Amino acid sequence: MKKIAVIGCGFVGSTYILDLLQQGVQADYLLVDKNTNLADGHVRDLRDSKSLKSHNGSTFNVGTYDDLKDADVVAITASIPTVPTADGEVFTDRLQLMTANVKILNEIALELKRVGFKGLSIIPTNPCDVMAGVYQKVTGFDPHKIISTGCQLETMRTRKMISEALGVNSDSVEGFVVGEHGSGAIVPWSVFRVGNVPMKQLIAEGKIKEEYVKDIFSRVVKEAFEIIKFKKATYFGIAESMSLITRAYIYNLNTVLGVGVQLDDKYVASGIYFTVPAVVGKHGWKLHSKLQLSQEEQAAFDKSALNIQKVTKDALDLIGFKN
């Protein structure tokens, strides 16, 4: 069986493992957390859940970094809490988490480098584009074996909102949100389609109101913060996103996903992790064809990319990383 590990056993990490179990992914699961009691509690709970699933030979154990040398997948979900303050205030930009989370990620990266981990690294810890870029620099791991969850959630939310307006299944909505996972995301309406019909045509035919479409971007960006305000954290959606990446990798599905990968020299900020369509299979990821964005969309994409390039450099400086 495959060996799948999660580092950080909070809401996201534990839900990720449960989602894989519910999807029927048989594996030796390892849960790693500084709070070993928390990890042990989840292990016991997951074993109970597995016992009710026939023909599933999965195992669950508390792990250490040394156990991860031969892991196939490691998901890094460790992060500072994103719960609202005592006054009910919620952070409004994922980049606000960088200063604290980069120190946590650096410690984890150095440990995985020490043990010689060679598998796929999945990084949802925010700001995930920056964290993935820092992680690659610190570890020196193959960039194609590092994926940030990127704008996968924004894509899911955009498809959801379009499908609700049109009364169709979200699978019928084609297109990817690209750029930064956060306020710098770009919804390229020029490439979005529903049942192979361009959004522009659907608006012209009166199938969907232009005002509704224009409002989708702000709603997508705010959605996570609304969820955090009401239930203190987001974890169902992001766990499903991580599960999808994991399954594409271990089953060699070669699925095109809108996830954070390292940009090549076709882009203005090459070397950073940023969301573009990528094919995910057993070798990690490879870039899909570059999207043909409108002039306005490309300008927004480039501006956001240059900002992430700067923040990634700032994060590396913060941990004292030198090339």
From Swiss-Prot:
Pathway: Fermentation; pyruvate fermentation to lactate; (S)-lactate from pyruvate: step 1/1
SUPFAM superfamilies according to UniProt: LDH C-terminal domain-like, NAD(P)-binding Rossmann-fold domains
Role description: Catalyzes the conversion of lactate to pyruvate.
Entry keyword set: Cytoplasm, NAD, Oxidoreductase
Similarity comment: Belongs to the LDH/MDH superfamily. LDH family.
Catalytic activity: (S)-lactate + NAD(+) = pyruvate + NADH + H(+)
Protein name: L-lactate dehydrogenase
Principal location class: cytoplasm
Binding site for NAD(+): V12, D33, Y65, T149
One CC-aspect GO term: cytoplasm
Entries under PANTHER family matching the protein: L-2-HYDROXYCARBOXYLATE DEHYDROGENASE (NAD(P)(+)), L-LACTATE DEHYDROGENASE
Catalytic residue positions: H181 (proton acceptor)
Binding site for substrate: R94, N126, P127, C128, D129, E154, T155, M156, R157, T234
Class of the enzyme per the UniProt entry, highest EC level: oxidoreductase
One Gene Ontology MF term: L-lactate dehydrogenase activity
GO biological process: one example: glycolytic process
A Pfam family the protein falls into: Ldh_1_C
Provenance organism: Mycoplasmoides gallisepticum (strain R(low / passage 15 / clone 2)) (Mycoplasma gallisepticum)
